[in-house]
Regions:
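Short runs of predominantly hydrophobic/aromatic residues within well-ordered alpha helices
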Residues: 14, 64-68, 135, 169
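Conserved helicase/translocase motor-coupling segment
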Residues: 1-65
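Charge-biased C-terminal accessory regions appended to nucleic-acid-, cytoskeletal NTPase
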Residues: 90-183
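Activity-critical C-terminal alpha-helical subdomain
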Residues: 36-130
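General structural signal for secondary-structure boundaries
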Residues: 11-17, 47, 73, 123-126, ...
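Generic serine detector
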Residues: 2, 36, 46, 58, ...
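Generic alpha-helical secondary structure signal
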Residues: 28-29, 74, 177
């Protein structure tokens, strides 16, 4: 993996992102002729969306609407909040986090865990907006309670345990590892 390079596609519709990525890849190939690549897209339900075929090694698609949907894990939020908040706010923040997830019906179904949960709600909800962007998002609710609590996406991800990371993410990194070993 020491020869990996990552480039963000900066959002937009999937077709435009792929076209920009293709141009970038063609330019890189002029410098490194044997370069390999892998493109990773959010799941798109629009009529113009394309979805990579299962055997495609260079195109990967999350099975959830936004990458933030993989951060819908209350315990990871609580651990992250405990790292940055004053001790006197910890219980209150934890309760607010639990209430948020319960209020949004984003709780684990019986006999499921975060790694294998398949409930459709985790795929289709707009995690980007409800967790971070909306005025009443979890991020903003917690920050209003304690201004020191600025839980960025990376902080939540770093607070996740291996068993809380969904199988989609494990699968992506396995594909990335396989690609790097083939290069």
């Amino acid at each position: 993996m020491s020869k990996m390079c990552f480039k963000t596609m900066h959002g937009g519709n999937k077709k435009a992102m792929k076209e920009r990525a293709d141009r970038h890849y063609e330019a890189v190939k002029l410098i490194i002729p044997n370069v390999s690549r892998m493109l990773l897209f959010d799941y798109d339900r629009s009529d113009e969306a394309f979805h990579p075929l299962p055997g495609n090694t260079s195109l990967v698609e999350w099975q959830r609407k936004n990458i933030e949907n993989y951060l819908l894990v209350p315990d990871a939020w609580k651990r992250a909040a405990n790292q940055v908040s004053a001790p006197q706010f910890a219980d209150d923040l934890g309760q607010r986090i639990e209430e948020f997830f319960a209020g949004e019906n984003l709780t684990l179904p019986p006999n499921k865990n975060w790694r294998n949960v398949t409930a459709n709600v985790f795929c289709v909800v707009d995690g980007k907006r409800i967790l971070f962007e909306n005025d009443d998002s979890l991020f903003h609710r917690l920050r209003k309670r304690d201004p020191a609590v600025q839980l960025l996406r990376e902080k939540i991800a770093h607070s996740m345990l291996a068993e809380e990371i969904h199988e989609d993410v494990h699968h992506f990194f396995q594909k990335l590892k396989t690609l790097s070993e083939a290069s």
